[in-house]
Amino acid sequence: MKLTNYDIIRRPLITEKTMASMADKKYTFVVDIHANKSQIKNAIETIFDVKVEDVKTARIMGKTKRVGVHIGKRPDYKKAIVKLTEDSKTIEFFEGL
């Protein structure tokens, strides 16, 4: 199954730590678990019309949760930290947060 650019980028990851890193033009996204760095770079450049300098990825394992005697697990996900070039514009989606 071929992933489109909009299938690769799931959602932005907004935390205090990621908001602080936006000053250095580093943006964090939850991405498809099967996407590689070159696909993520291409998707970000196409969707947001920016230039990407570096992509770092991490696979996060879901936590085990329990409700009474029932045990479940949150899904695993992959996050990508995307650094933009110095002459690139900022991503407008994140402005005003």
Curated annotation (Swiss-Prot):
- Check the record and name the InterPro entries matching this protein: Nucleotide-bd_a/b_plait_sf, Ribosomal_uL23-like, Ribosomal_uL23/eL15/eS24_sf, Ribosomal_uL23_CS
Q: Subunit composition?
A: Part of the 50S ribosomal subunit. Contacts protein L29, and trigger factor when it is bound to the ribosome.
Q: Which Gene3D superfamilies match?
A: 3.30.70.330
Entry protein name: Large ribosomal subunit protein uL23
Query: What job does this protein perform?
Result: One of the early assembly proteins it binds 23S rRNA. One of the proteins that surrounds the polypeptide exit tunnel on the outside of the ribosome. Forms the main docking site for trigger factor binding to the ribosome.
GO MF terms held by the record:
rRNA binding; structural constituent of ribosome
Per the record, the similarity remark reads: Belongs to the universal ribosomal protein uL23 family.
Where would you find the membrane-spanning parts of this chain? none
Of the GO CC terms on this record, one is: ribonucleoprotein complex
Alphabetically sorted, this entry's keywords are:
Ribonucleoprotein, Ribosomal protein, RNA-binding, rRNA-binding
Set out the biological process GO terms recorded for this chain's protein. translation
